[in-house]
Regions:
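C-terminal structural segment of proteins
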Residues: 1-281
Length: 281
């Protein structure tokens, strides 16, 4: 029996990719690094007829850090490039740390910043940290561009708010970030995905706590975080915020842990993350 081989579209410019995106819409599955979609295809979870690969578009692989502007990371920048960037290491060490925890060097050399967000894979490391940093994604079509906060980009398991004619082209992180911390709780091997991920940061004088890998999207509750605004972040307050997060989240059960197990871990890891965040605005 002949294999069903999908048609490959391989533009070399962003304009060319957007033209193809406009023409094919949802009929074409977009491929960035290919780490996630490769698994889905090998397990026959999805069988796309058309693949639109972005790997040849060099203009989407960049890191730009200017003192008076947000940090900009192109969608086709690999996890490894973020991890090894001297600019990131000097000015955004929390990103160096977070991306270094993703799987293995082999995976990080292939997986991209845009891909991990557009895939909306709930068990990935970067989305929670980027959300805590108040990062914005940039979605572009042939005739428009818009910024989408991470918490609005990911809408459900493996689903985003990107339109059929749009591509995610970059991530922007505001310079108002002060202290930030990322905690990855693994229930299995050191290279495993998180059972519970907690990111916390002071951004523009306000606390942002985001819990990942426990539900369909990064879990962020501004009303709970507001308890810390203008307050000394004591152990008692950190414990209370952790307790409220555990109550507010409806965790999933999977091979990394049951819902009840995750709920207990959430309370502890949120408290620990807050105890690591030094200072307040």
């Amino acid at each position: 029996m002949a294999r069903n081989v999908p048609e490959w579209l391989a533009p070399t410019t962003l304009k060319g990719a957007l033209e193809l995106r406009a023409r094919y819409g949802d009929e074409a599955t977009v491929v960035a690094g290919g780490t996630f979609i490769g698994i889905l295809m090998s397990q026959k979870i999805i069988m796309p007829q058309v693949l639109l690969t972005l790997r040849h578009i060099r203009e989407l692989a960049f890191i730009e850090d200017q003192s008076d502007r947000p940090l900009r990371i192109g969608a086709m920048t690999t996890h490894r490039a973020v991890e090894r960037s001297a600019l990131i290491q000097q000015n955004w060490p929390i990103l160096t740390y977070t991306f270094s925890l993703v799987a293995s060097p082999r995976v990080r050399n292939q997986a991209t910043v845009g891909g991990v967000l557009a895939d909306a894979d709930y068990a990935s490391d970067p989305p929670a940290m980027l959300c805590a940093l108040n990062a914005r994604t940039v979605a572009r079509s042939l005739d428009s561009e818009r910024e989408i906060p991470i918490e609005e980009l990911i809408t459900d398991y493996y689903e985003t708010s990107l339109r059929p004619n749009e591509l995610l082209v970059e991530v922007r992180i505001p310079r108002s970030v002060k202290q930030a911390v990322y905690r990855k709780f693994r229930s299995r091997s050191s290279e495993d995905r998180p059972c519970v991920a907690v990111a916390a940061a002071w951004v523009g004088g306000k606390l942002r706590v985001v819990v990942g890998a426990v539900a369909e999207r990064p879990q962020y509750f501004p009303d709970i975080c507001s308890l810390a605004n203008g307050q000394q972040l004591s152990r008692e307050l950190a414990t209370e915020i952790g307790r409220r997060y555990a109550e507010a989240i409806n965790p999933i059960s999977d091979s990394r842990g049951s819902a009840e197990y995750r709920r207990r871990v959430i309370a502890v890891e949120v408290r620990r993350a807050l105890e690591e965040v030094v200072g307040h605005e």
